[in-house]
């Protein structure tokens, strides 16, 4: 499986958070899966940290990049085709970072690992299910 981690998913995987469903944890731990994180997620975190909306500590982005390198999570750059895909998306919601992740998943045929309920509205494959969900 080729999977794109949403920004919150990356933070929760790094933190080994109990907010992660077992299915997502299993996907992230399976060495047969190719995992990706968008450079847009690093951009989003940088903006949120600079605005004081999230506190991750000094050098957080460098630490996250090192964690990605150590765990074979590939950085996904933003391409022109991703930008063109964003332009065609309906406006189910307006978060520009989410819209870019959706475009990247669609263009690069990636499954999104995200708790965001809006993603499925765009026809992208999303995995996020807690065992209590049925």
Where is each model-derived feature located?
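Short, well-structured N-terminal submotif of metal-dependent ribonuclease cores
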Residues: 1-38, 51-66, 108, 117, ...
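Active-site neighborhoods of divalent-metal-dependent phosphate/nucleic-acid chemistry enzymes
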Residues: 55-65, 69-115
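Generic structural signal for small/hydrophobic residues in well-ordered secondary structure
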Residues: 7-8, 45, 86, 105
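Short, structured coil segments at secondary-structure junctions
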Residues: 71, 122-123
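Acidic active-site catalytic centers that drive phospho-/nucleotidyl reactions
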Residues: 6, 44, 98, 116
């Amino acid at each position: 499986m080729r999977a794109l981690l949403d920004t919150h998913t990356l933070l929760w995987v790094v933190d080994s958070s109990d907010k992660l469903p077992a299915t997502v944890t299993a996907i992230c731990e399976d060495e047969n899966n190719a995992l990706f994180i968008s450079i847009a997620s690093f951009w989003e975190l940088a903006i949120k940290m600079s605005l004081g909306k999230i506190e991750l500590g000094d050098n957080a982005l460098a630490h996250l990049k090192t964690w990605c390198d150590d765990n074979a999570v590939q950085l996904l750059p933003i391409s022109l085709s991703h930008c063109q895909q964003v332009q065609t998306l309906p406006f189910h919601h307006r978060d520009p970072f989410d819209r870019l992740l959706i475009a990247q998943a669609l263009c690069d045929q990636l499954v999104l690992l995200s708790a965001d309920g809006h993603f499925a509205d765009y026809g992208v494959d999303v995995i996020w299910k807690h065992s209590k969900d049925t």
